Every structure is written in C-alpha cells, then in structure tokens.
Amino acid sequence: PCFMGWIRGNRPPKVAEETLASTWALPSFAKDDRPDHPTPKPLDAFGIPMRQHVARGGLCYEPFCGSGSQIMAGEANGRRVFAMEISPAYIDVAVERWQADTGRDAILEGDGRTFGQVRTERLGDNADAPADAPDKDADPEPARKPKSAA
C-alpha cells in the first residue's frame, strides 16, 4: 500500500478540478516486469496524488525510494521529486531506471560527475556489472523481530 498524509490543519492544496475516490485499484507489475525490486509501485500510485495536490514544477518528497517509481511519476507528470533510499543497490536501480526512461545522464549535484563516472570510481573494473540488488523475490526483512516467549 501507499499512503498520502498531512499534518492536521495543513491539508495540501487541491490543484486538480476532479474529486477522486480515497482508494484506487491499480495494476501491479508482473513478476518478470519488476525493476529489480520486490515491491515496485505502479506510477499512478504516485501520479494521481501528484496531479491532485502538487502544481506542475512542485516538489514531492520520497523517503523510501526503492525502485524509483515516484521519481518516474514525477518525471511523467512534470513534478520534482526529492528522494532518498538507504540501500545503495536500490539507488542504482532507481537511477538506472530513470536514465533508461529519459535517455539522460544522472548528474551528481556536488561536482557535476555523471552516475557512470561515480560508479566507475567506486566499483573500478566491475563498473559494468549490474547492481547487486537484493533478491527481488525474497521477502523483505521484518521491521521488528517477533517477541520470544521466555
């Protein structure tokens, strides 16, 4: 599931004229179409609320980037997305997905190097190897360990 929320009293502005239902039925990725991530989201899971609440050129925040679905939705809908991800392997997945879709090079803002240049520096001779993403069919690790009966 994906959630959208706000702090009471700070409801986001409505920029679209249509009124939408609070739940949506969206298609999921077929197993063979997943972009190297166990739970990729359909682009409309992010595109619908973007179009409803964020003006073109506006900013969206993505604290759990995963395979980059919100980045891709922002690209498709003319919104900016500030994203982060704890897993370096999934950053590679998201950046490579964006580059493949847009035909552009991702640029490191700090010094202007491309993603490819940074990858070569970090991986050396293995720079052309695909990102070592976790098994997309494996169950994600639970957030908490179950309590043991002692």
Please annotate each region the language model reported.
Residues 40, 78, 96, 118-121, ...:
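Short, intrinsically disordered low-complexity segments
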Residues 135-150:
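Long, low-complexity, intrinsically disordered segments
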Residues 1-91, 150:
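Core catalytic lobe of class I
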Residues 95-135:
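S-adenosyl-L-methionine
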Residues 45, 83, 101, 123-126, ...:
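General helical structural elements
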Residues 32-35, 120, 145:
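Positively charged, low-complexity intrinsically disordered regions
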